[in-house]
């Protein structure tokens, strides 16, 4: 019966798309140089780059909802962290000999510096306005308890001091000092408990929805940019001249139109995979997706909010995905401070918060079903974790909160359902399929269409991700003197690494902090800490990571 239902659904969708395409042929075809599918931060960032690089190019953006930045980019649907590995312990895994690997942390931090430079440049151009409306200084902290975890944090701190990007980090195992940094975390805690924390003053809270709205608002001021809301892509067809005809349905009046584009970017968040499959390019066959949602506990009580000014990340428990680590965060949303704790994983077959329950089934094909099965079989610990999260009660979530806020009161908190994150599953020659953390740009060989898949670190690295897309799709233009000069004006550090260059790191942090109105003090000498005891780690099966 299920197979019959699925088949009938697929036939209905297919017939609807054919009908839409036929109706659209009767209407006049719109032409555009660039079609941006999705009104989120990725499309907004790419459009902003292209507006400066090729101001004469025409652009059209289509968004299925009634406004932009209403899905994953919406401030309430994500953690709002400027991910720079200052506190996220999953970016510094422990090696078998007990040492700490910082390569991933350095790469994440370098990427966020590009985002800071991109935003600062847009403020100077008047594209982004009032930096405090979208980015604010919120110290980033790591906090752990227990001898093994404290030793890990010591080793992490010592390792990160070798990088110019982490020089301003502080370290302490003193209860009084940590209480000064984060009162909520320490008040009511056992004074004999062994704890440790790091704190970096230049951490940020970012409202990606506000950035998206401001970028798109600026794009709309140009006559060769068009924004179409309540518009859903129903079909994509490659033409003989390598342009694309995209059928777009108006969800309000039921009509359809064809848009002929020289280049198509699919920046539709969780919906990107299905649209990539619809394009028919062979590269799409390597991918599948698995949706995971997230919930947060939220407090707007002034007694809580005014007592906490930090993002405090812990360490994932044994058997849990590293990215699942709980954190208690100061957020600035809708112009006011709130505190969020989470995330707690949820499950839905939707690929978007405003998606369809058929999303997972309709994206499963004969070419990706086996990789999905391999991932499920190879990651049983992850499956157990997700099941345990879905089964959490209100009391379970509150007990998790009390580990980070011992004196928390139930009446101060409410549960909030955040957005959906579609994890990448990619075909693998050895394992059949692997779960990939991070984002991936998928494009055709001709460079006429590209999609962004994945979820983490996501919005905080939109600027470097879209730079990567430009290099992949417009390689010849990127290497031209004109584009090189423009890109280096947008991102002063473009083409070189900040890590290892203290003067360059401080120069860029000082520049972006001044323009964005962020706190920045020149780093002082590193804190003296006990020497970490590097203990060989027991061999354990690695738990696949997911983004929440």
UniProtKB/Swiss-Prot annotation:
Pathway: Carbohydrate metabolism; tricarboxylic acid cycle; oxaloacetate from (S)-malate (quinone route): step 1/1
Catalysed reaction equations from the record: (S)-malate + a quinone = a quinol + oxaloacetate
The EC number(s) this enzyme carries: 1.1.5.4
Compositionally biased tracts (Low complexity): 530-541
One annotated GO molecular function: 2-hydroxyglutarate dehydrogenase activity
Record keywords: FAD, Flavoprotein, Oxidoreductase, Tricarboxylic acid cycle
InterPro entries: FAD/NAD-bd_sf (IPR036188), MQO (IPR006231)
A Pfam short name: Mqo
GO biological process, one term: tricarboxylic acid cycle
Cofactor needs: FAD
Region described as Disordered: 520-548
Membership in a protein family: Belongs to the MQO family.
Protein name: Probable malate:quinone oxidoreductase
Native species: Shigella dysenteriae serotype 1 (strain Sd197)
């Amino acid at each position: 019966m299920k197979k019959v239902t699925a088949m009938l659904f697929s036939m209905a969708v297919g017939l609807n798309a054919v009908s839409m395409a036929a109706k659209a042929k009767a209407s006049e075809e719109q032409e555009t140089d660039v079609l941006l599918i999705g009104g989120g931060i990725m499309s907004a960032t790419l459009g902003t780059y292209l507006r400066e690089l090729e101001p004469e190019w025409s652009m059209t953006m289509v968004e299925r909802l009634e406004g932009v930045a209403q899905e994953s980019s919406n401030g309430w649907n994500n953690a709002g962290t400027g991910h720079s590995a200052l506190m996220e312990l999953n970016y510094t895994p422990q090696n078998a000999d007990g040492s700490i690997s910082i390569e991933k942390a350095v790469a994440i931090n370098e990427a966020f510096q590009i985002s800071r430079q991109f935003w600062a440049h847009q403020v100077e151009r008047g594209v982004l306005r009032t930096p405090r409306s979208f980015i604010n200084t919120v110290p980033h902290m790591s906090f752990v308890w227990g001898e093994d975890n404290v030793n890990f944090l010591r080793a992490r701190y010592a390792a990160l001091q070798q990088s110019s990007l982490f020089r301003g980090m502080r370290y302490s195992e003193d209860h009084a000092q940590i209480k000064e940094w984060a009162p909520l975390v320490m008040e009511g805690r056992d004074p004999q408990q062994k704890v440790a924390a790091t704190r970096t003053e230049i951490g940020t809270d970012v409202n990606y929805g506000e950035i998206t709205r401001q970028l798109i608002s600026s794009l709309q001021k140009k006559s060769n940019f068009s924004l179409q809301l309540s518009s859903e892509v129903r079909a994509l067809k490659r033409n003989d001249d390598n342009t694309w005809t995209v059928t777009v349905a108006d969800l309000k009046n039921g009509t359809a139109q064809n848009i002929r584009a020289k280049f198509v970017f699919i920046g539709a968040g969780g919906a990107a995979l299905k649209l990539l499959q619809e394009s028919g390019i062979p590269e799409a066959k390597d991918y599948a997706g698995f949706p995971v949602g997230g919930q947060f506990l939220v407090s707007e009580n002034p007694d809580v909010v005014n007592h906490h000014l930090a993002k405090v990340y812990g360490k994932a428990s044994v058997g849990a995905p590293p990215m699942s680590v709980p954190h208690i965060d100061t957020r600035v949303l809708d112009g006011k401070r709130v505190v969020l704790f989470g995330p707690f994983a949820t499950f839905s077959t939707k690929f978007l918060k405003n998606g369809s329950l058929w999303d997972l089934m309709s994206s499963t094909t004969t070419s990706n079903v086996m990789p999905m099965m391999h991932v499920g079989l190879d990651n049983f610990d992850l499956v157990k974790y997700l099941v345990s999260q879905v089964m959490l009660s209100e009391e379970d979530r509150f007990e998790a909160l009390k580990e980070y806020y011992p004196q928390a009161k139930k009446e101060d908190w409410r549960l909030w359902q955040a957005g959906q994150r579609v994890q990448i599953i990619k075909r693998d020659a050895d394992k059949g399929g692997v779960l990939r953390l991070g984002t991936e740009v998928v494009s055709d060989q001709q460079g006429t269409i590209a999609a962004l898949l994945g979820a983490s670190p996501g919005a905080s690295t939109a600027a470097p991700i879209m730079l990567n897309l430009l290099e992949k799709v417009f390689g010849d233009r990127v290497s031209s003197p004109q584009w090189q000069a423009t890109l280096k004006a947008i991102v002063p550090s473009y083409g070189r690494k900040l890590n290892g260059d203290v003067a360059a790191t401080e120069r860029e942090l000082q520049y972006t902090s001044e323009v964005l109105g962020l706190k920045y003090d020149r780093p002082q000498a590193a804190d003296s800490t006990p020497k970490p005891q590097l203990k060989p780690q027991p061999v354990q099966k690695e738990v696949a990571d997911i983004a929440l």
